Amino acid sequence: MKTQEIMTMLEAKHPGESEFLQAVKEVLLSVEEVYNQHPEFEKNGIIERIVEPDRVFTFRVPWVDDQGKVQVNIGYRVQFNNAIGPYKGGIRFHPSVNLSILKFLGFEQMFKNALTTLPMGGGKGGADFSPKGKSEAEIMRFCQSFMTELWRNIGPDTDIPAGDIGVGGREVGYMFGMYKKLAREHTGTLTGKGFEFGGSRLRPESTGFGAVYFVQNMCKQNGVDYKGKTLAISGFGNVAWGVAQKATELGIKVVTISGPDGYVYDPDGINTPEKFRCMLDLRDSGNDVVSDYVKRFPNAQFFPGKKPWEQKVDFAMPCATQNEMNLEDAKTLHKNGVTLVAETSNMGCTAEASEYYVANKMLFAPGKAVNAGGVSCSGLEMTQNAMHLVWTNEEVDKWLHQIMQDIHEQCVTYGKDGNYIDYVKGANIAGFMKVAKAMVAQGVC
């Protein structure tokens, strides 16, 4: 395999799909050497097959707004690969949603799910719809319309969607209700459900908790004392909220959150129940701003239109969206003495930023490893649904802690390069090898 030849082919077949092509190139560069050591991969056309989704569904989603006007959005479901288990991945409702973004997310999801060691394939879906500014009734009508088309292509052993940006417990509940009505079954077809009807303990916190567990393992592996360190995070939703809680519990001081309007710096730390509650209130307000934080905690400062990466801290964890941390941000963090960056959003760093961290031997881990706690907890929810059991917080947290430790160990095994651990390479190779071997064993299909 030659990466450039594959990329030239993909660029010709999928012009304009920049996010998807970026994700594929990162993986191919990491796995090229090990791929060429396995002639059975070449014989079975693994690369040519693994970079194309099994199937893609595109459909219109008509719904009626509160003024009685018919609105139409575009819905998608990308079923990328089910070699190791049923398709599994979230649904995103955001105006930016397009096929390139969902293919990139589905491609990443395939390897992320492989890292968890749970039997889950990769998929992703969504629509170019924003719940922000919509009434409760409008959101319900949209979710129900979306599911009337999606339901026939999903199922507990086929494809199990979950939440993502713009899709929380409320939206999952509305979609599950319509699925249940259409399919006439109450099964674990969606995860991220409310606890009252089949959801798992710790699901809202799991991505953030898992990310901090991964950072904890990175620190232990590399001889870094994390207690007392300062941490800059972006975002203010579920992921950032989970990170702030677990980091505080482990003695790490979170000092920033951010939104589309800018970022907040709190020198006292975002580390009390009142401040965690404030993060949830900011999210639930629907205003998509963080500036109101300083009204409740006046010792904090708000920096309009800026990113939190300019602050001098020890660790950084982007928790908002893809490509939010660019090369200039990476250089600023390095200059300010940041020693560890954990990509907590999906592909939160541009390719140039990721390459800069690795080139400068900084401790840097990619999203497919760091944020796998969310889908891991979804897998645990699937298990509980299938067994008709409910686990306690402690049981779920124990599993989550173990899974994140296992993911870290896989990254170290495949990413160790002398005294340095290339977590990007390690995560990509570990996930790729599991999927590729499963595809070889199952034949060309």
UniProtKB/Swiss-Prot annotation:
Active site per UniProt: K124
A cellular component term, taken from the record's GO annotations: cytosol
Keywords attached to this entry: NAD, Oxidoreductase
Known function: Probably involved in degradation rather than biosynthesis of glutamate.
GO biological process: glutamate biosynthetic process
Protein name stated in the entry: NAD-specific glutamate dehydrogenase
Family: Belongs to the Glu/Leu/Phe/Val dehydrogenases family.
